[in-house]
């Protein structure tokens, strides 16, 4: 019997999502205006934030752009925020959006080189612990110069490459045959082998993701909010690194040691070994590629390596905004490697654009948080403390909010509030500088707890690889837990023990950094 029009509309609504999920989103859309108009805009704002987090948590049931987008459109429509505020948020974060559009696409054209390097890593080194440490430290190093999103895009590209090679061969095809690696119906696949390989890839992706947080917190180009904090404090690349180092260096060592421990003792879903048969396929693929590599192919790798040098130099010296450097990577890589037809170019943008749209929706929710002043009580409470305790409170408050909200937003809001406190004479300039360190480390480190806080984690969760290797929201939170605990505690101990203040004094005495005055930043442009 044919469905009625109302039934057909319900079936079409959010597509293949479970019925309970569709009902939940519909309930949210009914409840929100009632709360806003008849209870309190403040309560409605926090409920909206929780609902949006729910859509992110259910990313594998339905991509968050649609349900989150509906909630955001309604929020603007009923007056929780305004279209101009949403546009202002997007303008303030344009660099992040350009980064997603261009840098991620640029990395797509460097995949051959990356696959070559990481394949060598996996095929030449048999110890899982050493491979894990290599992926974690390589991600940390790269994230100090590249944005964490760029690095995670690299690792995702590598993981998809490995997965598709294995899937193709295990499905009875040769390396050169066309194949759909997302197909779940292939009969030749050995399920136990496939599950073990999925677990192995999950381990490497999570170690890499944590690595991006460990490296990303250290420098002003590592994360988008670092750029905003550095701009407000008028710090250059070297000074930013030195001021952060009393917290970031102990955390880096602790993070790498945690990577070793979880692999050694096979806890929290780590310790999965690469099956022998899969290792053989990847080794055979590497040998096949090496033996069939023409001079043309070799020159492609050389060009990609040179572009990689330009990429790191351009970002480290901040020669242009991140997105524009990404655009230059696209142009150079395609021009010198002969990729000139539009269809081939288009594929590079498929991975990043849905996430770019999702981030724009995210900024609408940020608009609600700002307009309804949802974080104001927390910030005023934190400013009520003094001295070292104030630093600890700011670190913890930042950390808790970064676990549930985007850390770019949290860092931006806090640094502006602290700057306002400096301008009104509530705090000294030296205390402002210490608070900037507490805010930066607080937004970057505890936020690894959930995909909501780290844009790189959210990108991983909503990427094409996540469903293939069964990486769900809950599993990411569980696998990140040992890191969350260690990074958060080591970070707070570095501040609470007075180590940050003492080491900062040493840096002043040795004249590696200088005392700034409040006048320096009175003219700085506010991020929001």
From Swiss-Prot:
Keywords, sorted A to Z: Antiport, Cell inner membrane, Cell membrane, Ion transport, Membrane, Sodium, Sodium transport, Transmembrane, Transmembrane helix, Transport
Reaction(s) this enzyme catalyzes, per UniProt: 2 Na(+)(in) + 3 H(+)(out) = 2 Na(+)(out) + 3 H(+)(in)
Keyword Cell inner membrane attached: yes
InterPro entries the record matches: Na+/H+_antiporter_NhaB (IPR004671)
A single GO cellular-component term on record: plasma membrane
A GO term, aspect molecular function: sodium:proton antiporter activity
Transmembrane segments: 28-50, 67-87, 98-118, 140-160, 240-260, 305-325, 350-370, 391-411, 449-469, 476-496
Protein origin, superkingdom: Bacteria
Record's bilayer topology term: Multi-pass membrane protein
NCBIfam families according to UniProt: NhaB (TIGR00774), PRK09547.1 (NF007093)
Family according to the record: Belongs to the NhaB Na(+)/H(+) (TC 2.A.34) antiporter family.
Protein name: Na(+)/H(+) antiporter NhaB
Organism field: Shewanella frigidimarina (strain NCIMB 400)
């Amino acid at each position: 019997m044919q469905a009625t029009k109302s039934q057909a509309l319900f079936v079409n609504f959010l597509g293949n999502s479970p019925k309970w999920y569709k009902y939940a989103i519909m309930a949210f859309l009914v409840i929100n205006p009632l709360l806003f108009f008849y209870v309190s805009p403040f309560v409605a704002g926090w409920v909206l934030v929780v609902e949006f987090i729910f859509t992110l948590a259910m990313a594998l049931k339905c991509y968050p752009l649609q349900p989150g987008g509906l909630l955001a459109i309604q929020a603007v429509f009923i007056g929780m925020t305004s279209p101009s505020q949403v546009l202002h948020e997007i303008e303030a974060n344009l660099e992040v959006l350009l980064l997603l559009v261009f840098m991620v696409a640029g990395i797509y054209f460097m995949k051959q080189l990356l696959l070559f390097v990481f394949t060598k890593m996996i095929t030449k080194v048999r110890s899982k612990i050493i491979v894990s440490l290599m992926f974690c430290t390589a991600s940390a190093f790269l994230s100090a110069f590249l944005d964490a999103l760029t690095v995670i895009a690299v690792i995702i590209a590598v993981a998809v490459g490995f997965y598709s090679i294995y899937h193709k061969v295990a499905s009875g095809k040769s390396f050169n045959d066309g194949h759909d690696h997302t197909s779940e119906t292939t009969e030749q696949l050995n399920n136990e082998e496939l599950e073990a390989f999925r677990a192995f890839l999950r381990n490497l992706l999570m170690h890499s993701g944590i690595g991006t947080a460990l490296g990303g917190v250290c420098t002003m180009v590592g994360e988008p909010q670092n750029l905003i904090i550095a701009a407000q404090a008028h710090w250059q690349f070297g000074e930013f690194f030195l001021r952060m180092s009393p917290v970031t260096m102990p955390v880096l060592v602790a993070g790498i040691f945690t990577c070793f421990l979880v692999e050694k003792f096979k806890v929290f879903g780590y310790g999965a070994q690469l099956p022998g048969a899969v290792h053989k396929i990847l080794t055979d693929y590497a040998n096949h590629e090496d033996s069939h590599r023409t001079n043309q192919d070799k020159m492609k790798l050389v060009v990609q390596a040179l572009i990689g040098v330009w990429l790191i130099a351009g970002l480290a010296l901040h020669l242009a905004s991140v997105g524009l450097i990404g655009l230059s990577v696209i142009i150079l890589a395609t021009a010198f490697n002969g990729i000139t037809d539009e269809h081939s170019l288009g594929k590079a943008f498929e991975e990043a654009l849905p996430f770019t749209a999702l981030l724009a929706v995210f900024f609408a929710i940020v608009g609600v948080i700002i307009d309804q002043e949802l974080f104001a009580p927390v910030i005023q409470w934190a400013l009520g403390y003094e001295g070292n305790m104030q630093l600890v409170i700011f670190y913890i408050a930042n950390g808790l909010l970064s676990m549930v909200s985007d850390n770019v937003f949290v860092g931006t809001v806090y640094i502006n509030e602290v700057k306002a406190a400096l301008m009104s004479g509530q705090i000294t300039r030296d205390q402002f500088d210490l608070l900037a360190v507490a805010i930066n480390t607080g937004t970057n480190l505890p936020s690894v707890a959930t995909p909501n806080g780290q844009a790189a984690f959210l990108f991983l969760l909503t990427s094409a690889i996540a469903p293939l290797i069964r990486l769900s929201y809950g599993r990411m939170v569980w696998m990140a837990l040992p890191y969350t605990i260690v990074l958060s505690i080591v970070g707070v101990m570095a501040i609470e023990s007075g180590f940050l203040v003492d080491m900062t004094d040493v840096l002043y005495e040795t004249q590696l950094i200088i005392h700034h005055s409040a006048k320096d930043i009175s003219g700085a442009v506010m991020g929001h």
